[in-house]
């Protein structure tokens, strides 16, 4: 069976919420691995992946057709902006990675509720 077949099977059995949870779990795991190692390339990759995730959420929440309540959308957009700013500080060595992990875990808690 090809990789595409597995992806199709996975997409048909997961709800959008489960897909979002899985993606947050993968990104958060990558961020947590960076705490254990001191490799800058791993840190840069994990931070970039996390920023892309949040940028996608921000873009989706900016769309008029998004069905989330306006206050929720505004909160996600605010978090995405914070994630971007904090990520830059982490990459410059001016901040720790833990707050990014904590925010992602909070989102995961909400998705699993």
Question: What is each residue range found by the language model?
Answer:
Residues 1-55, 62-65, 74-113:
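N-terminal intrinsically disordered, cationic/polar leader segments
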